[in-house]
A protein has these predicted regions:
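Bacterial Sec-dependent N-terminal signal peptides
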Residues: 1-24
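Cell-envelope and extracellular/periplasmic
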Residues: 23-486
Length: 486
């Protein structure tokens, strides 16, 4: 073989292994065939090319031009577009032309977190036994054929640009098997109400703490205050700050989204965190919104499920109250504008299973929050009864709730469970609970002068207290120490 042939073969091999060497215009992985573009927002289209190369983007009657800068980076912005189920092609041209096919315009959401968000549709389809929530009439893994729901699964090691422009898929068949069940059912519920294309992006890692999802520099912010004492910096206990942010969130920026869904916390609860988690959570919400240049971007999350942390084999000691304290920390995020939370204390068959199976109901409940708060369907009730205030009257406590919907109720028709009260001795005992309108009257013959209340204040919480829409009441304690300082 002569030298010339060796050179040709070497170049051919390089171009086959690294197609970007031959393609002057390169797109990020998130831009590809089958994608959904966010409606009614400016849509950035970006990538790299040779410095100074002229780039043209044509889509939906729009024609945009720009030039790659000295670093080879370029970006154009498409004008806001109405939703469209009409599949269209986008042409990106420099010295080469890339044609992205089958593109829709609609609503796009990013869902993230740990294993309960990552929990795949293939696991969901194997569920047997007692049904909780509004179970689908069929196995979506076998029957899903709605071409207007698209999915993109962020894989940790496969977000580099490539020449296939794959990644986005119609939510059906093989592509749907590995996708987040919560994300899919959320998107399905949105489509059934909005009747426009839905794009769901899933970026989740089993067992992950919250720190890897936050840009490392953001966790180096000023220490927070707790009862007048300085907390250590939020990154003091390590937790691999920024690890998954760098590989699974940053590559998505600035792909336009409507909002975020978050289902995470078990790994931080194992650390017995409470207020520290609340500050980390706030940092994550604010930093992601800042990344997408929208300080009011919707952020909806799941209050994690009951689980027996105190009976687990973890090396740290836990009490049955560690989880309620974590729930309390999660709920503090509701003080941040444009956030929403769902409670799932009723979706657990066993507190030794950290992965409760009813993901279709988790997705549905998250969709209720979005439909009410983002899409302004104000007739949709999106939360269970939520503590508002209490008044002490003689030897009873009168508790007022918000999110009562069409009225307060008991899931099984029996007296309400889960309430405890205490007097000055702080010894909590089970309380008798009587519903009156949007209030609950609590009392106990063992507490003559009640002062404080707790509801579902245990890791095994499973109260029958709901509103008429079937949504469970949110755990709380009336003496929450954090609400005045967070």
């Amino acid at each position: 073989m002569n030298f010339k042939k060796i050179i040709i073969l070497t170049l051919a091999t390089l171009l086959s292994v690294y197609p970007e060497l031959s393609a002057k215009v390169i797109l990020p992985k998130i831009l590809g065939h089958n994608m959904v573009l966010q409606r009614l927002k400016t849509v950035p289209i970006w990538g790299t090319a040779n410095p100074g190369e002229k780039i043209t983007v044509v889509f939906g009657g729009q024609h945009k031009e720009t030039m790659a800068n000295d670093s080879g980076k370029w970006e154009v912005k498409l004008n806001p577009m109405a939703a469209s189920e009409l599949p269209r092609e986008m042409a990106i041209t420099g010295t080469n032309t890339i044609r992205l096919k089958n593109i829709l315009v609609g609503e796009v959401w990013l869902c993230s977190g740990q294993s309960n968000m990552e929990y795949a549709m293939r696991k969901n389809s194997k569920i047997q036994g007692t049904v909780k929530g509004k179970k689908p009439l069929e196995d979506d893994l076998l029957t899903s054929n709605n071409t207007n729901i698209r999915i993109f699964l962020v894989r940790r090691k496969y977000m580099s640009p490539d020449s296939t422009h794959g990644g986005w898929d119609v939510a059906s068949g093989v592509a749907l098997k590995d996708f987040s069940a919560v994300g899919y059912f959320y998107g399905k519920e949105l489509y059934q109400k909005l009747h426009i294309p839905i794009g769901m992006i899933s970026s989740a890692v089993p067992g992950s703490r919250i720190e890897p999802w936050i840009e490392a520099i953001k966790l180096e912010a000023s220490p927070k205050m707790k009862d007048g004492k300085v907390l250590n910096p939020l990154n003091a206990d390590n937790g691999d700050p920024g690890k998954f942010y760098a590989t699974m969130i940053k590559p998505l920026i600035p792909f336009p989204l409507r909002g975020f869904l978050w289902y995470q916390g078990e790994s931080n609860c194992f650390l017995n965190e409470n207020i520290r988690y609340a500050y980390k959570f706030k940092t994550l919400i604010e930093s992601w919104r800042n990344d997408w240049k929208n300080e009011t971007m919707p952020f909806y999350f799941v209050q994690i499920a009951p689980y027996g942390y105190s009976i687990s084999k973890d090396v740290r000691p836990h009490t049955p109250e560690n989880l309620p304290e974590f729930w309390e920390a999660q709920a503090l995020a509701l003080t941040i504008p444009n956030t929403g939370m769902i409670t799932i204390t009723d979706l657990v068959d066993s507190i030794v299973d950290i992965h409760p199976a009813y993901k279709w109901e988790v997705g549905r409940r998250l969709s209720l929050v979005a439909l009410n708060k983002t899409y302004k369907f104000k007739d949709i009730i999106c939360s269970g009864p939520t503590y508002k205030q209490m008044k002490i009257k003689n030897n009873r406590i009168e508790v007022t709730f918000t999110n009562t919907g069409s009225g307060l109720g008991s899931r099984n028709g029996k007296p309400l469970t889960g309430f405890t009260i205490a007097g000055v001795d702080e010894r909590f005992v089970e309380a008798q609970a009587e519903m009156r309108g949007n209030k609950v009257i609590l009392s106990s013959p063992d507490v003559k002068e009640p002062l404080t209340i707790r509801f579902s204040w245990t890791e095994s919480a499973g109260s029958n207290f709901i509103n008429a829409e079937g949504l469970p009441a949110v755990p709380f304690r009336s003496d929450n120490p954090w609400v005045k300082i967070f």
